[in-house]
From Swiss-Prot:
The reaction(s) this protein catalyses: 2-C-methyl-D-erythritol 4-phosphate + NADP(+) = 1-deoxy-D-xylulose 5-phosphate + NADPH + H(+)
Lineage of producing organism: Eukaryota, Viridiplantae, Streptophyta, Embryophyta, Tracheophyta
Protein name: 1-deoxy-D-xylulose 5-phosphate reductoisomerase
Keywords, ordered alphabetically: Chloroplast, Isomerase, Metal-binding, Oxidoreductase, Plastid
Gene3D superfamilies: 1.10.1740.10
InterPro entries, alphabetized: DXP_reductoisomerase, DXP_reductoisomerase_C, DXPR_C, DXPR_C_sf
Positions bound to 1-deoxy-D-xylulose 5-phosphate: S15, E16, S40, H63, S76, N81, K82, E85
GO term, biological process aspect, one: response to jasmonic acid
An example Gene Ontology molecular-function term: manganese ion binding
Organ and tissue specificity: Mostly expressed in flowers and, to a lower extent, in leaves.
Role this protein plays: Enzyme of the plastid non-mevalonate pathway for isoprenoid biosynthesis that catalyzes the NADPH-dependent rearrangement and reduction of 1-deoxy-D-xylulose-5-phosphate (DXP) to 2-C-methyl-D-erythritol 4-phosphate (MEP). Required for chloroplast development.
Predominant subcellular localization, coarse grouping: plastid
Cofactors required: Mn(2+); Mg(2+)
Family: Belongs to the DXR family.
C-alpha cells in the first residue's frame, strides 16, 4: 500500500523473487496463474528423515550450492527460508497462497518459475550467485553486460535440471509458513521471530536440530 501511495516500484533482490519479477515482465494483467518457487533442499536434502536427530551445527552449515551466512544456511536446511519466500511472493506479486508452490531443484539453476493462464511456464536460469539478481535490481530496467571474467556463462549442455516434491515430514516449516500467511495479522512476524530464536539457540548448541 505504501509503494502504491507514493507511486514507486519495489524491486526484489532475492534470487527467487527477482526470477519471478523477470518472468512477469510484459505479461498482461491477470495472466499469472501460479508461482513456482525452487528450493535447493539445503544441507539435508539427501539425508533420511530418521537421521536428522543426529545432525550437528557444522552439518547444517554445509550448503551444497550457495555460500551464505549461518542463519540463512540453517534456514535453507529447514526450508524455513522458502516458507518466508512464499509469504513474500504473496505480498510482492498478489498471488494467493494456493497458487504458490515449492519444488526441490537440487542444482539451483532455475531460480523460480511462473505459470500463465494458458499453462505456459516461464523460468529464469543462472548460476547460484547472488551477484546476478542484485545486479539486475540495481540496473533495472537495463541489462548490464558481464564478461566471462566476471562469472562463467551458463552451459545448458553441462548441467542437470531435476525436480522433486518437498518432503513435508522433513520440512515441516513449510506448512507453518503457509498457515501463518493465511492467518495474517501478526502471525508471520511471530513465526519469523520464533524461528530467529530457534536458529540462534541451535547455532549456539543450546538445542538440537529437531527441537
Amino acid at each position: 500500500p505504501l509503494a502504491k501511495k507514493h507511486n514507486v516500484k519495489i524491486l526484489p533482490a532475492d534470487s527467487e523473487h527477482s526470477a519471478i519479477f523477470q518472468c512477469i515482465q510484459g505479461l498482461p494483467e491477470g495472466a499469472l496463474r501460479r508461482i513456482i518457487l525452487t528450493a535447493s533442499g539445503g544441507a539435508f536434502r539427501d539425508l533420511p528423515v530418521e537421521k536428522l536427530k543426529e545432525v550437528k551445527v557444522a552439518d547444517a552449515l554445509k550448503h551444497p550450492n550457495w555460500n551464505m551466512g549461518k542463519k540463512i544456511t540453517v534456514d535453507s536446511a529447514t526450508l524455513f527460508n522458502k516458507g518466508l519466500e512464499v509469504i513474500e511472493a504473496h505480498y510482492l506479486f498478489g498471488a494467493e497462497y494456493d497458487d504458490i508452490e515449492i519444488v526441490i531443484h537440487p542444482q539451483s539453476i532455475i531460480h523460480s518459475m511462473v505459470e500463465t493462464q494458458d499453462s505456459s511456464v516461464l523460468a529464469q536460469l543462472g548460476w547460484p550467485d547472488m551477484r546476478l539478481p542484485i545486479l539486475y535490481t540495481l540496473s533495472w530496467p537495463e541489462r548490464v553486460y558481464c564478461s566471462e571474467i566476471t562469472w562463467p556463462r551458463l552451459d545448458l549442455c553441462n548441467v542437470d535440471l531435476t525436480f522433486k516434491k518437498p518432503d513435508h515430514v522433513k520440512y515441516p516449516s513449510m506448512d507453518l509458513a503457509y498457515a501463518a500467511g493465511r492467518a495474517g495479522g501478526t502471525m508471520t512476524g511471530v513465526l519469523s521471530a520464533a524461528n530467529e530464536k530457534a536458529v540462534e539457540m541451535f547455532i549456539d548448541e543450546k538445542i538440537s536440530y529437531l527441537d
